[in-house]
């Protein structure tokens, strides 16, 4: 894989230049396109560009190649949620490896999905677990539109 192309793609991503970042990734050899790191970078770029269908395909590809890749579950679920497929997003998270449950993002996103699906108690449990693992998630929750229906219960 071309290190230059990878670095250029990362740089373009940091600048918010989605098309340029994807163009750099397209320039690497066909063999490199199955590299999990490259797929994960492409996934991040697609998510940044809010290209949810393509991001979901990249997440599925990452999980085929690397079935224990935590980002494949987290980002694949997020893409599903953004596509309005929140129940599928929740189910994808639940299919992840045990290591996933140590990640505060798992608990935060799961809590958001549960809140959207109307499962208040489960949402609150999961969100509180995310806060215990990483207190910065409490700040995210204050502004997250997915949590509007349960925001009052998140105060304590």
Model-predicted regions and their roles:
Residues 1-48:
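Alpha-helical segment of the N-proximal tetratricopeptide repeat
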Residues 36-105:
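Alpha-helical adaptor scaffolds
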Residues 115-139:
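TPR/TPR-like (Sel1-like) alpha-helical repeat modules
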Residues 132-156:
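Terminal, low-structured helical/coil segments at or just beyond the last alpha-helical repeat
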Residues 14-15, 48, 82, 116, ...:
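Register position in tetratricopeptide repeats
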Residues 7, 41, 75, 109, ...:
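"A position-specific structural signal for the A-helix of alpha-solenoid helical repeats
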């Amino acid at each position: 894989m071309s290190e230059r192309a990878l670095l250029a793609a990362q740089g373009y991503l940091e600048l918010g230049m989605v098309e340029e970042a994807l163009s750099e990734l397209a320039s690497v050899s066909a063999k490199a396109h199955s590299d999990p790191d490259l797929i994960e970078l492409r996934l991040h770029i697609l998510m940044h560009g809010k290209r949810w269908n393509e991001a979901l395909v990249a997440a599925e590809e990452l999980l085929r190649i690397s079935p224990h890749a935590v980002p494949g579950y987290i980002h694949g679920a997020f893409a599903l949620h953004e596509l309005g497929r929140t129940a599928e997003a929740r189910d994808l998270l639940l299919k992840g490896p045990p290591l996933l449950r140590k990640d505060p993002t798992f608990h935060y996103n799961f809590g958001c999905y549960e809140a959207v699906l109307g499962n208040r108690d489960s949402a609150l449990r999961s969100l509180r677990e995310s806060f215990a693992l990483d207190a910065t998630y409490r700040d995210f929750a204050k502004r997250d539109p997915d949590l509007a229906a349960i925001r009052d219960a998140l105060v304590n």
